[in-house]
Amino acid sequence: MPGAAKNVEAPEWYVYQFEVRKVPFYVGIGHRERASDRLRWVCSQIKRELAGKPGKWDLHTRVIKYFILCPEPVTHRCICKGLCRADALKVEKRRIIDLRSSGHVIANIQYNRRPLPSPEEVIKFIRKHPKPAGLSCRRQA
């Protein structure tokens, strides 16, 4: 039902991560299609800028924008589903902490290092990993 309030107790929530080159750089929670909606939203902001209008950007959407324009595939992967919102938030926090403790440079605001990494630092971390065969990106970070 469009516009209906989300039931935070219903097991309809999931945890996802955005990846480039199979390198996770952002972890979030979603309800229905939020993760794939985020990619469409970034594309809409790019179109706004191309039309001379201002885009709205934050840390992870700047990273997504860079790789969309590169172009290099940005994928989202569901890492846990069928959760209530409170459990999804716990899984999200644990995943962010695990990625950070393993040395990942990520684009999350919550549970990330301070000062936050710049988009360029996140991009540089991703780009130091080998590209899957067949990808080409000439744009520099």
Range-by-range predicted roles:
Residues 18, 35, 39, 49, ...:
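Positively charged, low-complexity intrinsically disordered regions
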Residues 1-37, 86, 90, 118-141:
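GIY-YIG nuclease catalytic motif and its immediate N-terminal context
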Residues 94-106:
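Short arginine-rich
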Residues 42-45, 95, 129:
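Alpha-helix boundary/capping residues
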Residues 1, 28, 50-53, 80, ...:
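Intrinsically disordered, low-complexity segments enriched in small/polar residues
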Residues 23-24, 103-121:
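BZIP DNA-binding basic region
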Residues 31-89:
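Conserved short loop/helix modules at catalytic or binding sites
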Residues 69-70, 102, 128-132:
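Surface-exposed polar/charged interaction patches
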